A protein has these predicted regions:
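Intrinsically disordered, flexible peripheral segments
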Residues: 1-345
Length: 346
């Protein structure tokens, strides 16, 4: 799934997203990585430095220029949080198949590149009138986190889109993020479609499917998923107690039940506790991975990757929807594709 939220303060965000104690994998990229043409333009490449990241979120560019307002009125950025469905987190983090996380990261990056090409905008003066103009570049800090607040397996990526983009005039300007919010369902569907291609190529089978393109892995029961999802249970319980049920209610319930982040003192012990719990639940990730490997080996070449034609069509809304649906072999109404996907356009 994909959730979108504004990043209010630069200092707190830089500390939270780049904190290495949030990770559980020994080989996790503690500092995150820069993504986007906007980052390239600013000379930001490779691993994210926390101090540099904080400066960018404050609107302070490497060349000394400032973008946006100073102080509290400045919007630091937009946090796009891409979360893998629970079954895939269990296979990856409990079972140790890091290829799944790599596949999801690649899918997220592909979506971000599409988003910056089609959704990045700014406001600028054009012949004496302020207009919204397309920029085609974003500055993104991409961070991998592996647990939720209850220290359960929860692989997700924070794509923190800074409030800066280069305008057609070559100047750094504040990003207009309206389309990132408006197209969040489309962005999630694109990510999951790309992810599905990858995991099927690895030999995994698709299980339960739900709205907005989300799907679970076959072989992981709802009981097993729920046992590792107490954080979700807390949010749902709070929602049931609330009078408000409209848009934003889930976000409010999440904030109301959010505990303080706890530093993971012993990652090895945490991993062992996950493994012990999995055994109690009868979750055999090793067997699932072995079956997937055997299935992939029996189908040499696996599922083909996206063709060049589909990639070219990916920037054209309805054409992308049609092409990806044909590529995946899905029909109208398939839960892997949002109903209104073909009507969406940047």
């Amino acid at each position: 799934m994909l959730s979108v939220a504004n990043v209010r303060t630069a200092g707190g965000a830089a500390t939270y997203f780049a904190a290495d104690n949030y990770y559980t994998r020994a080989d996790a990229d503690r500092s995150g990585e820069w993504v986007g043409k906007g980052a390239e333009i600013l000379g930001l490449d490779g691993r994210v430095d926390a101090k540099q990241f904080e400066a960018i979120l404050k609107g302070l560019l490497p060349d000394g220029n400032r973008v946006g307002s100073e102080g509290r009125d400045h919007r630091a950025g937009t946090d796009l949080t891409f979360s893998m469905p629970k079954s895939w987190s269990l296979i990856a983090l409990v079972g140790g198949d890091n290829r799944i996380i790599d596949a999801y990261r690649d899918a997220v990056k592909e979506t971000l590149h599409w988003a910056e090409k089609n959704l990045a905008e700014t406001r600028m003066d054009v012949k004496g009138r302020e207009k919204v103009v397309h920029t085609g570049n974003l500055v993104v800090g991409l961070f991998q986190h592996d647990t939720n607040r209850n220290q359960e397996p929860n692989a997700h990526f924070h794509a923190v889109v800074a409030n800066v983009t280069q305008g057609p005039d070559g100047k750094g300007r504040a990003l207009r993020n309206d389309k990132l919010w408006a197209h969040n369902t489309l962005l999630n569907a694109m990510t999951m479609a790309r992810f599905r291609l990858s995991v099927e190529k690895l030999g995994y089978e698709i299980g339960e499917q739900s709205k907005h393109g989300n799907f679970e892995a076959a072989g992981v029961s709802r009981e097993q998923r729920d046992a590792f999802s107490t954080r979700r249970a807390e949010v749902l319980a709070q929602l049931a107690r609330m009078d408000t049920k409209g848009p934003g209610a889930t976000d409010a319930a999440t904030l109301m039940t959010r505990a303080a982040k706890v530093t993971i003192q012993d990652r090895a012990a945490l991993s062992r506790s996950w493994a012990d719990k999995a055994t109690e639940l009868g979750f055999d990730a090793t067997a699932l991975i072995a079956r997937a490997n055997a299935r992939a080996a029996s189908n040499i070449g696996g599922v083909p990757t996206l063709s060049d034609k589909v990639q070219q069509l990916a920037s054209h809304g309805k054409e992308w929807a049609t092409a990806i649906a044909e590529r995946l072999g899905v029909k109208q109404g398939d839960p892997l594709v949002p109903r209104d996907l073909s009507r969406r356009s940047p």
